């Protein structure tokens, strides 16, 4: 089933997203008009998280959802008060950005808490607190991965920066621009060689995994924001803050810090 919207434009079109599970847009010369098409995921109506009867952001109290939020994509709860998804091209771009940021946030949240947990259980780190760890590279001995100089021994911030730019830039460029392993695959959910475990083989299971990914990713983005605020306000890592709160919840909570916090002190 396809929903067509004709918008005024005069450029030769393009096709974005070839996977049957993704947002399909075809733009072509049609007089002075442009045809934009969306293709609904075939397996979506069989899942409670997709379609018209999917859960809404306020449950039974949700207002009329916008007509352009049809429930064909994971994480669509019918909420768009700012109209960010009204334009199909903007919607497609924002979906891609959200999924990518969700994945980075999930990795980041794990990286913020895991070293502290290991440190509290006897694993030696030069610095286990996430926002202090990078400063170890400026110390006399440099930065050792997991405290072991035989793994990764970094002493140059410029070398680290160059490696990140080159390696991460290459991967991101490959994802966006395509290549032998990614040709003809979707930019958000490539599958193929990028799915060695075959998680996308079953369309129904894959549709559910997309929902789980976006929900956990959104939670991780909020978590990272909380870690940033904690670091600024308390100067401690998330695990130490949690431990302090458990030991004395009255003195260590958001309200107590908010009423006593003075920026710059």
UniProtKB/Swiss-Prot annotation:
Annotated chlorophyll b 5 binding sites: 164, 261
Superkingdom of origin organism: Eukaryota
Transmembrane stretches, start-end: 99-119, 151-171, 219-239
Chain sites annotated for binding chlorophyll a 1: 79, 85, 98, 218
Binding, chlorophyll a 3: 136, 146, 213
Binding site for chlorophyll a 4: 216
Localization, UniProt: Plastid, Chloroplast thylakoid membrane
Positions with a binding annotation for chlorophyll b 1: 57
GO molecular function: chlorophyll binding; metal ion binding
Positions bearing Phosphothreonine: 40
Entry keyword Chloroplast: yes
InterPro entries referenced in this protein's UniProt entry, alphabetically: Chloro_AB-bd_pln (IPR001344), Chloroa_b-bind (IPR022796)
Positions bearing N2-acetylarginine: 38
Residue sites binding chlorophyll a 2 per the record: 101
Post-translational events: Photoregulated by reversible phosphorylation of its threonine residues.
Keyword set, alphabetical order: Acetylation, Chlorophyll, Chloroplast, Chromophore, Magnesium, Membrane, Metal-binding, Phosphoprotein, Photosynthesis, Photosystem I, Photosystem II, Plastid, Thylakoid, Transit peptide, Transmembrane, Transmembrane helix
Family named by the database record: Belongs to the light-harvesting chlorophyll a/b-binding (LHC) protein family.
Entry note about domains: The N-terminus of the protein extends into the stroma where it is involved with adhesion of granal membranes and post-translational modifications; both are believed to mediate the distribution of excitation energy between photosystems I and II.
Oligomer and partners: The LHC complex consists of chlorophyll a-b binding proteins.
Name of the featured protein: Chlorophyll a-b binding protein 4, chloroplastic
Gene (name only): CAB4
